Amino acid sequence: MERIVECVPNISEGRRKDVIEAVVNEVRSTPNVMLLDYSSDESHNRSVITFMGEPEAVVDAAVKLAKKAAELIDLTKHTGEHPRMGAVDVIPLIPIRGITKEETVELSKKLGERVCIEADIPVFLYEDSASAPNRTNLAAIRKGQFEGMAEKVQQDEWAPDFGGRRIHPTAGVVAVGCRMPLVAFNINLSTSDVSVASKIAKIIRRSSGGLDCVKALGIMLEDRNIAQVSINMTDFSRTPLYRVLEFVRFEAARYGVQVIGTEIIGLTPMRALVDCAEYYLQIENFNADKQVLENYIQ
């Protein structure tokens, strides 16, 4: 069986098109890898790149990408709404076909070691690859961001898994690990008051007692002068998109605010969108496996 791994690096650059293209070209030029998608956000000052391929080829592409990002992105000059700790901030690997989660964890460790050696960036292993429970959650690792990371890594519980107690002077550190597919889902609000988005994010995220498998923060989109609830959904089968959207809509109404649009960043499983169609259309006795045309022509 063909072995396929997906990789979704996030880089801390969403404004300089030449830099973004230079980083993406490292993926394009790697044999046995397919570039699927990349998108950028100027307010976040961040880009999400998605590619997949044979496991070793994906590792090669990710290492090349990390090296180029470290060469071209200087976090001492970086500003943006999204939290960040590295020029390449996070490199997740997702098992797609013919490879187990356990094998992908081992692959992520090889990737982390190579990124450390070849790009000179200290590496934290996170999610299913985490070396300790406190490193499972990316937000916990990233707390303090680039500006506080040099001090943070001196603590015993926050020493990087690869690279020693230091950070790259301009590229920071990076999180590398195996995770399951997630949905990056942003909800835009009819207000320029970011505190409203932050309050809603706190209510809906799991860490504050909200919805299961939901991570969220409130940010300001300066270019549009609106606030946004930025969400990562780590298991849409347990908490579907429509439930998150309706929860946010309900909470926003308390502040006299409306949902004015949503965004999906990068690729998302078809099932997540079909679930929404089934819910909002109130389709009775729906069977996506048998009633969605594309399922017969894969």
Language-model features: locations:
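Long, contiguous binding/interaction regions
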Residues: 1-298
